[in-house]
Design a protein with these regions (language model features):
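Conserved Ser/Thr-centered positions that define the repeating blades of beta-propeller domains
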Residues: 60, 170, 234-235, 285-291, ...
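Surface loop/turn signatures of beta-propeller and other carbohydrate-active proteins
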Residues: 25-28, 63-82, 102-138, 157-160, ...
């Protein structure tokens, strides 16, 4: 079955000056959506109680990543934006969505997304994302007059999933500007919690004062958790991050499933960087001179811990 829509400038579903063509092809449980002259977003209708379908912005590259989205089948509870590649064509693949799903009829193209919130009980003083789901605060740092708040974030629903690092900045810790997600889920897995540093020494060679993020990549293989530590660096004051090609930088030497939440700090007496990782019932320490190659040092503690916050009187962060 093929469905073809011609969307012109000024139409409700397209705010671009160039006409967009949206073509949908379905075969079995797979839907292919081709958009010519794509707008910034494909607006996705969501139905909370439906099972997740798998959605992917397809380019044929190894970096293509599936997102789990509760696309509307019977009714639309709300909508979320899905960013499209800019150029002549964007291709979106969906697996697990019925042919008669409401989402296929109501999805729209747009260059904007209305983030106005009308929920009476929505917090005003405490930070919340414009839309989606959040929990752990990650990578809290200060640079050039800005406080950076990264956080666990699902931009495609109000439940846990598709872990990204969301990002907001503030100059007073009260008023926050919401930015695009800084680090997105990728083929290595969800982007779990971690920390950031400002590399004032240029230890990693990405440039003096580059912001470097360390996070846990989480995936499931053969029914077991796989958690490894990765790094990404930013040269534009934390707005966007480039994932290090040598990831992962730390893996559990004994195959632990619970191995996450890296915290990085500088220890002046040894003139080294240290990483502390929650390793099941212990905390493991790793040492590095260049922030890329890490050597296991020791472990400490008994009992389960996560999202560690460790400082030293000799630390210089």
């Amino acid at each position: 079955m093929k469905i073809k829509y011609l969307l012109s400038a000024g139409a409700l579903v397209a705010l671009s000056a160039t006409a967009q063509t949206l073509q949908t092809t379905q075969k079995g449980d797979t839907t292919i959506i081709k958009v010519e002259n794509p707008t910034k977003y494909l607006i996705l209708p969501i139905e909370e109680e439906r099972p997740e379908a798998q959605l992917q912005l397809y380019s044929g590259k190894a970096t293509d990543t599936w997102m789990d989205v509760r696309l509307a089948v019977g009714k639309t509870d709300y909508c979320v934006p899905f960013a499209l590649t800019q150029g002549k064509e964007a291709v979106v693949k969906i697996v697990g969505l019925p042919k008669d799903a409401v989402a296929l009829k109501e999805m729209k193209l747009s260059d904007t997304f209305d983030t106005t919130n009308t929920d009476y009980y929505r917090p005003v003083y405490h930070h919340t994302p414009l839309y989606g789901w959040m929990n752990d605060a990650n990578g809290l740092t200060y640079k050039d007059g800005e406080y950076h708040l990264y956080f666990q974030y699902n931009p495609y629903g109000s439940k846990w999933g598709n872990m990204h690092w969301g990002h907001s900045v503030s100059r007073d810790l009260v008023h926050w500007d919401h930015l695009d997600p800084a680090i997105a889920r990728d083929p290595m897995g969800h982007i779990f919690s971690g920390s950031t540093i400002v590399d004032t020494r240029n230890s990693a060679g990405f440039g003096k004062n580059a912001i470097i993020a360390y996070y846990t990549s989480h995936s499931m293989r053969n029914g077991k958790q796989v958690q490894v530590q990765c790094m990404a660096y930013s040269k534009d004051n934390g707005r966007t991050f480039i994932k290090y090609k040598g990831n992962p930088v730390v893996t559990p030497f004994d195959g632990l499933e619970n191995f996450r939440d890296p915290k990085i700090f500088w220890y002046e007496p040894t003139k080294s960087w240290y990483m502390i990782v929650s390793a099941d019932k212990n905390m493991r320490f790793y040492q590095s001179k260049n922030l890329k190659k890490w050597t296991y040092v020791s472990q400490w503690g008994e009992g389960f811990g996560a999202c560690l916050l460790y400082t030293s009187d000799a630390a210089d962060e």
